[in-house]
């Protein structure tokens, strides 16, 4: 067996470089969060053209004594691809434009949520959790479950809902164009756990004859207003799901254990069981290994799987695991419509 001592200097340097990139990768994300909080992307856009360092620092709400440090922050973010630098001026890249407040597909909330203190702390409790009896590392770090914590912390709840909305904007664009046939012939649809209704609003706007309902916990829908063919109802998917031609579950089941998933799915099946033919449940979630078979080598779903472990002690599932859940919940058949990005669309028949 080869030892470290027997490795060549070049091999050791490559290993050190690899570890350095991994260890320091968090700095790129922390710097990006800082840039958002300081308003750097929007400052550059509002300027209307690339900004030099003096113009940029003058536009930011910072202590003047810290202005000389901005160029070091920008250097890191340029290397990470969020900004471009030419002739001592900074401009937005296509990636950086996704950080603008007014971009309809912006991912600002996703960035801010992933580096929220309350969501980072459980990662540092991971090794302790492996040794104790807590349900999830989040509980080890905070003394309560994620859902109990967010119910008492409106700020974190808003950040979390905003992150889910970012994801929903991207998915909605695909659903109402490439996958619009999923909604053809339907008269009613319930988006279970749909939060502020980002996804349901897009569907309702695209299909004006489809009655769309968002069903979520009271605190999630308390301040939401329905409009036209969209409304909001307070409810608990573990107790009952409102009746409809179709039930939509987007990024819901990966938050829960197999046992809880079966409970949710059974309630969804009851909600469509009284309908004429065409009743179905639409699940949008990850399917481990399927993306790789489709040529997507992005390790993002592996990262998401660990995120589910840390927050909820839940997981991303492979097709065999999904099939068992659907069968245990009483569904007669399912089909995977298509994969896109990390996500798969699955149609369940009662």
Curated annotation (Swiss-Prot):
Q: In which pathway does it act?
A: Alkaloid biosynthesis
GO MF annotations in UniProt: O-methyltransferase activity; protein dimerization activity
**Which key words are in the record?**
Alkaloid metabolism, Cytoplasm, Methyltransferase, S-adenosyl-L-methionine, Transferase
Could you tell me the superkingdom of the organism this chain comes from? Eukaryota
Segments passing through the bilayer: none
The reaction(s) catalysed by this protein are: cephaeline + S-adenosyl-L-methionine = emetine + S-adenosyl-L-homocysteine + H(+); deacetylisoipecoside + S-adenosyl-L-methionine = 6-O-methyldeacetylisoipecoside + S-adenosyl-L-homocysteine + H(+); 7-O-methyldeacetylisoipecoside + S-adenosyl-L-methionine = 6,7-O,O-dimethyldeacetylisoipecoside + S-adenosyl-L-homocysteine + H(+); norcoclaurine + S-adenosyl-L-methionine = coclaurine + S-adenosyl-L-homocysteine + H(+)
**Temperature note:** Optimum temperature is 40 degrees Celsius with N-deacetylisoipecoside as substrate.
Give GO cellular component annotations, separated by semicolons: cytosol
* Matches recorded under CDD domains: AdoMet_MTases (cd02440)
Stated pH dependence: Optimum pH is 8 with N-deacetylisoipecoside as substrate.
Which positions are catalytic residues? 254 (proton acceptor)
Positions of S-adenosyl-L-methionine binding: 193, 216, 236-237, 250
Q: Where in the cell is it found?
A: Cytoplasm, Cytosol
Q: What does this protein do?
A: O-methyltransferase involved in the biosynthesis of ipecac and benzylisoquinoline monoterpenoid-isoquinoline alkaloids natural products, starting by the condensation of dopamine and secologanin, and including emetine and cephaeline, drugs used both as anti-protozoal (e.g. treatment of ameobiasis) and as emetic agents. Mediates cephaeline 6'-O-methylation to produce emetine.
Family (UniProt):
Belongs to the class I-like SAM-binding methyltransferase superfamily. Cation-independent O-methyltransferase family.
Q: What is this protein called?
A: Cephaeline 6'-O-methyltransferase IpeOMT1
Which organism does this record belong to? Carapichea ipecacuanha
Q: Its gene?
A: OMT1
């Amino acid at each position: 067996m080869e030892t470290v001592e027997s490795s060549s200097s070049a091999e050791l340097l490559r290993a050190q470089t690899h570890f350095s990139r991994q260890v320091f990768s968090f700095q790129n994300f922390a710097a990006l969060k800082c840039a958002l909080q300081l308003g750097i992307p929007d400052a550059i856009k509002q300027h209307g053209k690339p900004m030099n360092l003096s113009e940029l620092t003058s536009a930011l709400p910072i202590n003047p004594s810290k202005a000389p440090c901005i160029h070091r922050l920008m250097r890191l973010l340029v290397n990470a691809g969020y900004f471009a630098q030419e002739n001592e001026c900074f401009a937005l890249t296509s990636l950086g434009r996704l950080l603008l407040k007014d971009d309809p597909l912006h991912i600002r909330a996703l960035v801010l949520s992933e580096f929220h203190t309350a969501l980072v702390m459980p990662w540092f409790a991971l090794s302790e959790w492996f040794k104790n009896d807590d349900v999830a590392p989040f509980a080890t770090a905070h003394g309560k479950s994620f859902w109990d914590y967010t119910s008492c912390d409106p700020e974190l709840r808003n950040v979390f809902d905003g992150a889910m909305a970012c994801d929903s904007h991207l998915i909605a664009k695909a659903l109402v164009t490439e996958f619009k046939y999923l909604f053809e012939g339907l008269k009613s649809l319930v988006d279970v756990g749909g939060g502020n209704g980002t996804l349901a609003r897009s569907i309702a706007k695209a299909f004006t004859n489809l009655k769309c309902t968002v069903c979520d916990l009271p605190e999630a829908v308390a301040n939401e207003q329905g409009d036209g063919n969209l409304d909001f109802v307070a409810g608990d998917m573990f107790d009952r799901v409102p009746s409809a031609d179709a039930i939509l579950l987007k990024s819901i089941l990966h938050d829960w254990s197999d046992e809880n998933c079966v409970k949710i799915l059974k309630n969804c099946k009851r909600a469509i069981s009284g309908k004429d033919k065409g009743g179905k449940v639409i699940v949008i979630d990850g399917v481990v290994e399927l993306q790789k078979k489709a040529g997507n080598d992005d390790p993002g779903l592996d990262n998401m799987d660990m995120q589910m472990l840390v927050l909820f002690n839940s997981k991303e599932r492979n097709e065999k695991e999904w099939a068992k859940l659907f069968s245990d919940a009483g569904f007669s058949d399912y089909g995977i419509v298509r994969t896109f990005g990390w996500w798969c669309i699955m149609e369940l028949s009662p």
